[in-house]
């Protein structure tokens, strides 16, 4: 029997939410710290399934990690060489662990088996494996061609220093390559083949690599140059920003409910691209206040939420939240250039279309777009399937602010990035039923 939670019709209270640490920053930071030549104390690390999978993997690879407090730990770097050259690594459905670890282990070489949950074995990795093979890596598919699970063997340096890679499926492939190639000590040039999607996630990678002492030359997101003799040296202390993707639910709530909501842990100088979500809300009726360590959204009650037609390539995760905001506009809304949704935790375009229809919305799906026309009145007590996708569960919680109760199946899927989400959400609302 699937566990579910019923969210009654609710009113949002003026609120401040302290965000959990960013998933994207947490897992990148853990790996970079593990590969550094010194120790790094990491503060405000996200505690979630995805970071747990990365920590378990690093432990199996022989990395010494001291747990100092619930959200603070010290990683003792390995100097760019994992002590354990043989390991069996289960990585769940954590793309931010699977892709970068694949690249790092392939570049270092050894005898490694990488696998995950069934959905991870449906998420493509062929473009990354192809690029690593050009660099001399031994990457073998143990199941379906171009998909996990993988076996990684010893790398032979073949002298190849120019690595082409496709960027139109997942920016994590480029992130993985960027983080791994400095471990060789050689100069490399990475050349993009076709379009690079989700560029803001590459910005996160490059900014974090710079904090760990490796400066990559970025030539207009077409060519990336890694210097020779690079090595990772960690800052003694590193503070993880709040998760900007997780912020989107609370910021959207402030817009939908015309009630001020402030999120702390991100701000005007955040390195995460998903902070741009607040700027998109501003275009459709929100008042946004930016601080150094907060973003606040509200809306005057007399101002309507506007419809939108948005190219969401720059905010693929936060854009899911806009699919729910569309229900508050009363008019057809469109999200474009979201093809990457198809290969995330689930096929998010199909899943979003299915569940919005349960609420009475008219939805037209395209390969890389979704068109949403809200109904005059939403269907109450719709039972929303979440497809083991944390973002589906968090998005659809907002329906309870639109005047109808909603039932969310498998609410614990939020443990991937935000285990306390439903507790936090209910603390911000008052039941009006």
From Swiss-Prot:
**Which residues does UniProt mark as catalytic?**
317
Q: Which residues bind 3-phosphoshikimate?
A: 23-24, 28, 170-172, 198, 317, 344
Record's InterPro entries?
A: Enolpyruvate_Tfrase_dom, Enolpyruvate_Tfrase_sf, EPSP_synthase, EPSP_synthase_CS, RNA3'P_cycl/enolpyr_Trfase_a/b
Localization recorded for this chain is: Cytoplasm
A GO MF annotation of the entry reads: 3-phosphoshikimate 1-carboxyvinyltransferase activity
What reaction gets catalysed by this protein? 3-phosphoshikimate + phosphoenolpyruvate = 5-O-(1-carboxyvinyl)-3-phosphoshikimate + phosphate
Gene Ontology CC: one annotated term: cytoplasm
Locate the residues binding phosphoenolpyruvate. 23, 95, 123, 172, 348, 391, 416
Its annotated pathway?
Metabolic intermediate biosynthesis; chorismate biosynthesis; chorismate from D-erythrose 4-phosphate and phosphoenolpyruvate: step 6/7
Q: Name one GO biological process term.
A: amino acid biosynthetic process
Note the superkingdom of the native organism: Bacteria
Q: Kindly list the cysteine pairs connected by disulfide bridges.
A: none
The keyword Zinc is annotated on this UniProt entry = no
Keyword terms of this UniProt record: Amino-acid biosynthesis, Aromatic amino acid biosynthesis, Cytoplasm, Transferase
Q: Which Pfam families match?
A: EPSP_synthase (PF00275)
Q: Does the keyword tRNA processing apply?
A: no
**Enzyme class (EC, first level):** transferase
Which Enzyme Commission numbers does its entry carry?
2.5.1.19
Under PANTHER family, the record lists: AROM/DEHYDROQUINATE SYNTHASE, PENTAFUNCTIONAL AROM POLYPEPTIDE
Assembly description: Monomer.
HAMAP family recorded:
EPSP_synth (MF_00210)
> Family assignment?
Belongs to the EPSP synthase family.
> Tell me, what does this protein do in biology?
Catalyzes the transfer of the enolpyruvyl moiety of phosphoenolpyruvate (PEP) to the 5-hydroxyl of shikimate-3-phosphate (S3P) to produce enolpyruvyl shikimate-3-phosphate and inorganic phosphate.
Q: What is this protein called?
A: 3-phosphoshikimate 1-carboxyvinyltransferase
């Amino acid at each position: 029997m699937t566990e579910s939670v019923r969210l009654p019709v609710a009113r949002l209270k003026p609120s401040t939410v302290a965000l959990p640490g960013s998933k994207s920053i947490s897992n990148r930071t853990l790996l970079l710290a593990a590969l550094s030549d010194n120790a790094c104390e990491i503060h405000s690390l996200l505690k979630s399934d995805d970071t747990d999978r990365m920590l378990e993997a690093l432990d199996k690879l022989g990395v010494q990690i001291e747990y100092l407090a619930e959200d603070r730990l010290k990683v003792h770097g390995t100097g760019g060489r994992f002590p354990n050259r043989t390991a069996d690594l289960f990585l769940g459905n954590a793309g931010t662990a699977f892709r970068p670890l694949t690249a790092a282990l392939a570049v270092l070489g050894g005898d490694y088996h990488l696998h995950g949950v069934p959905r991870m074995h449906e998420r493509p990795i062929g473009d990354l494996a192809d690029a690593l093979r050009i660099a001399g890596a031994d990457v073998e598919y143990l199941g379906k061609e171009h998909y996990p699970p993988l076996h990684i063997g010893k790398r032979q340096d073949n002298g190849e220093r120019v690595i082409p890679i496709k960027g139109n499926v997942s920016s994590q492939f480029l992130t993985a390559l960027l983080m791994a190639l400095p471990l060789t000590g050689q100069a490399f040039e990475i050349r993009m083949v076709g379009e690079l999607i989700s560029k803001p996630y590459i910005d996160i990678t490059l900014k974090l690599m710079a904090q760990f002492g490796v400066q990559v030359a970025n030539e207009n997101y077409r060519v990336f140059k890694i210097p020779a003799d690079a090595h990772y040296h960690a800052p003694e202390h590193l503070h993880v920003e709040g998760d900007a993707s997780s912020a989107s639910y609370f910021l959207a709530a402030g817009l939908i409910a015309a009630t001020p909501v402030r999120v702390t842990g991100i701000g005007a100088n955040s390195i995460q691209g998903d902070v741009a979500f607040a700027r998109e809300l501003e275009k459709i009726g929100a008042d946004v206040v930016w601080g150094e360590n907060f973003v606040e959204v509200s809306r005057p009650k007399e101002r309507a939420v506007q419809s939108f037609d948005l190219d969401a390539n720059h905010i693929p995760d936060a854009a899911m939240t806009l699919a729910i905001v569309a229900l508050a506009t009363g008019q057809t809304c469109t999200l474009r250039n979201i093809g990457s949704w198809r290969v995330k935790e689930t096929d998010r375009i199909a899943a979003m279309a299915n569940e919005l229809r349960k609420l009475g919305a008219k939805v037209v799906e395209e390969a890389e777009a979704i068109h949403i026309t809200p109904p005059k009145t939403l269907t109450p007590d719709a039972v929303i399937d979440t497809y083991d996708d944390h973002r589906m569960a968090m998005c659809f919680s907002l329906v309870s602010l639109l005047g109808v109760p909603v039932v969310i199946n498998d609410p614990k899927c939020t443990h991937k990035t935000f285990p306390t989400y439903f507790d936090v959400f209910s603390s911000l609302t008052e039941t009006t039923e």
